Regions:
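Glycine-rich phosphate/pyrophosphate-binding beta-alpha loops
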Residues: 22, 47-52, 94-95, 265-270
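A structural signal for short hydrophobic beta-strand segments in well-ordered beta-sheet cores
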Residues: 31-34
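C-terminal helix-coil-helix/basic helical segment that borders enzyme active sites and/or dimer interfaces
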Residues: 159-162, 182-245
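A short core secondary-structure module
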Residues: 39, 43-89
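Glycine-rich beta->alpha junctions and the first turn(s) of the following alpha-helix
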Residues: 86-184, 266, 282
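Conserved small/polar residues in nucleotide/adenosyl-binding loops
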Residues: 1-5
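Glycine-rich phosphate/cofactor-binding loops in nucleotide/flavin-utilizing enzymes
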Residues: 125-132, 136-140, 230-287
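A short, Trp-centered hydrophobic/proline-enriched beta-strand micro-motif
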Residues: 9-18, 61
């Protein structure tokens, strides 16, 4: 039922992993699910829940055993967002947008059938899912599109009366960015090809996440540089239907500041880049 409705877009899912005291150290999460016979009673809080205010359901990591090593007492639970006791509160991010949320659970009754796999083995399932999430966070298609946008803006923006793209320092930064992106795309295709054969991405997803987020952040940084002061104003209303006022600067400058600030977070979510470096070091060198 869950898979069918997800594939048909009838259900929108949110992810309930991070908590105020459990981000990079996710295993220290405090949300509990107490066995009450035919259901679990869930209490706790999740944070940074992306688009949780639109979600129909949320898959959560919850503590089902407090007497064992943290990773061994975690279960993977599916919860309907309209269940009594579930409350969503907005978090306004640095770019002024409402994209993420806090989700509170107060005596939420969840049927026992909503557990995924076996009780207390949720940590294993979550780690597996995160390898695919990190591969996606690399965002190769996004970066390719943003790079083309950067080249267009660099041709239109002037420096000392000449197109910015003719500036040797700036053009070399674009070239370095494109080289990094091409190398990352090849590595990404290799990783996806292996996944199509049934192999989990593993350490490769961590490498992609590290490099991909740095490329995405660098792209928005160069876009901001290319536009100069015109990148500063952000007027979301100028994208509304029927808005006829004169934009501040060229129309393509509108979302640049928002994108720049929003991209600061991507090296943190999905497992911070510092954590990913630890994963790579452990897998490669046994550190």
């Amino acid at each position: 039922m869950c898979i069918r409705d997800s594939l048909s877009n009838e259900d929108w899912w949110a992810q309930g992993y991070s908590e105020p005291g459990a981000g990079s150290d996710l295993a220290s999460l405090k949300t509990t699910a107490v066995d009450k016979g035919d259901h679990y009673l869930v209490n706790g809080q999740k944070t940074w829940t992306t688009l949780g205010h639109h979600a129909d359901k949320i898959f959560c990591l919850v503590k089902t055993d407090l007497n064992v090593k943290p990773q061994l007492g975690i279960s993977f639970l599916l919860i309907d967002m309209d269940t009594p006791g579930v409350e969503v509160k907005p978090i306004i991010t640095l770019d002024g947008e409402h994209e993420v949320n806090e989700v509170w659970f107060t005596n939420v009754k969840v049927p026992k059938k909503n557990i995924v796999g076996k009780e207390n083995e949720g940590w294993t399932y979550a780690k597996y899912l995160l390898t695919f999430e990190r591969t996606g966070i690399a965002g190769v298609p996004y970066s390719k599109s943003a790079l083309n946008h950067l080249k267009m803006i660099s041709k239109r923006s002037l420096k000392n009366g000449k197109p910015l793209i003719e500036d040797p320092i700036f053009s070399s930064e674009i070239a370095e960015l494109e080289i990094d992106l091409l190398a990352m795309e090849i590595f990404n295709l290799r990783t996806v090809s292996a996944a199509a054969e049934g192999k989990a991405p593993g350490m490769e997803s961590s490498l992609l996440k590290i490099k991909g987020t740095l490329v995405r952040q660098k792209t928005t940084e160069l876009l901001r540089k290319a536009l100069g002061p015109q990148a500063l104003p952000y007027l979301p209303e100028q994208f509304d239907e029927g808005w006829n006022e004169m934009p501040v600067g060229p129309d393509y400058a509108g979302p640049i500041a928002k994108q720049y600030f929003n991209m600061r977070k991507i090296s943190i979510y999905g497992g911070s880049n510092e954590i990913q470096k630890n994963i790579v070091a452990k897998a490669s060198f046994g550190l």
